[in-house]
Amino acid sequence: MSKQTLVLLYGGRSAEREVSVLSAESVMRAVNYDKFLVKTYFITQMGQFIKTQQFSEKPSESERLMTNETIELTQKIKPSDIYEEGAVVFPVLHGPMGEDGSIQGFLEVLRMPYIGTNVMSSSIAMDKITTKRVLESIGIPQVAYTVYIDGQDLEACLVETLARLTFPIFVKPANMGSSVGISKAQTKVELRKAIQLALTYDSRVLIEQGVVAREIEVGLLGNDKVKSTLPGEVIKDVDFYDYQAKYVDNKITMAIPADVDQSIVTEMRSYAEVAFKALGGCGLSRCDFFLTQDGQVYLNELNTMPGFTQWSMYPLLWENMGLAYPDLIEVLVTLAQEMFDQRESHLI
C-alpha cells in the first residue's frame, strides 16, 4: 500500500519558533509510518523555506529536526516547492506568520490540504482583542479588559484602565501565544512598563483584569460536527504561567481530567464548542478557561494550533478520551482533506 505524504512545516518567523520545533519533533515520532511518509521543511526567522529531512519510518529518540545550527542554505527552496499532489500539510507553527491565517492562505493558493483552522478563523483567533469582541457578541463570559493601540494616548489608556480594572492586571500582545510578551502588573509604573514590553511584540495590546482562578483547558476536534474533551487543568508551581515556566523550567503539571463539578464540565464544553463555531473554526483548537473559587467560568482564549509536544495538554486531553496520539494525527489528516474538498467544491 502506498503511503500518503505528510508535510511538516516547523520553525517560523515568530518568537514561538522554538515551541514549534519541539511540537514538530513530537509529531514526527507519533506518526503511523505504516500509513505516512513524512517530509519536513524548516522556515527560518527571515521566512526562508529550507528542505530538511524525510522519514519513512519512526526516527530514533535521539533524532532531531534540523534547525538554524544544522541547516545548509544550499537546501533553500522556493516556498511553492513544498507542493506535492495528494500530500497533506501539518503547519506546526505557532504565533504570527504561523497560526494567524498567513500560512493558511498560502497553502490555499497552492491548493494543498492542511491541518488546522482556515484563514478567517485563524486570523480572528490569533488576535485576542478581536476574539474577545466576537465572544462578547454571543454572550460568553470573559474577564474585564481594556485595549491599547500603538499611537494612542497612553496616559488616557492608563486612566481608563485604572478606572475599570484593579491590580493585579495582566498585559498581553494581542497576537502572541505561549505566554510570550505577557506581564503581570501590580502598580501603575509596572503597568506602563508592561504595555511598553507588549508593544515590542505587537502594535495591539490587551489589558486584562487579573483573577485568582484555576486554569482549565478543553480540546476541540472536528469540522461541521465538533467534539470536545473532558477538561484538563494546568497546575502551576509558579505565580505566573509564563513561557519560561511552560517550556524551560517545567514548573507545571497537568491533571487530566480536571477535578471539577459535572455542571462546570458541561458548561465549559458547551462554551468551547459554541466559541469554536462562532469563530468559524475547523480541524482543531484548544479552549482555555479560568475557573474562580466561587464557580465563575471565564473563557480566556482559543488556541488554533495548540502545542503538540510530549507534555502538551491538547494531545493528552484526547488520549484521555481514548484517542491515541497517532490516531489523532490520522483524524486531523482526514479533517484537513474534508475541508480541502469543501473549499474546492465552492470554487465555480
Swiss-Prot record:
Reaction equation(s) it catalyzes: 2 D-alanine + ATP = D-alanyl-D-alanine + ADP + phosphate + H(+)
Gene: ddl
Chief location: cytoplasm
The protein's annotated pathway: Cell wall biogenesis; peptidoglycan biosynthesis
Name this polypeptide is given: D-alanine--D-alanine ligase
Family statement drawn from the similarity comment of this UniProt entry: Belongs to the D-alanine--D-alanine ligase family.
Locations listed in the record: Cytoplasm
The ATP-grasp domain, residue ranges: 132-334
GO-annotated cellular components: cytosol
NCBIfam families per the UniProt record, alphabetical: D_ala_D_alaTIGR (TIGR01205), PRK01966.1-4 (NF002528), PRK01966.1-5 (NF002529)
Function: Cell wall formation.
Protein keywords: ATP-binding, Cell shape, Cell wall biogenesis/degradation, Cytoplasm, Ligase, Magnesium, Manganese, Metal-binding, Nucleotide-binding, Peptidoglycan synthesis
BP GO terms, sorted: cell wall organization; peptidoglycan biosynthetic process; regulation of cell shape
Residues that hold Mg(2+) 1 according to the record: 288, 301
Binding-site list for ATP: 162-217
Cofactor note: Binds 2 magnesium or manganese ions per subunit.
Superkingdom of origin: Bacteria
GO molecular function: ATP binding; D-alanine-D-alanine ligase activity; metal ion binding
Enzyme class label: ligase
Cofactor(s) in the UniProt record: Mg(2+); Mn(2+)
One Pfam family cited in the UniProt record for this chain: Dala_Dala_lig_N
Binding site for Mg(2+) 2: 301, 303
EC number(s) stated in the UniProt entry for this protein: 6.3.2.4
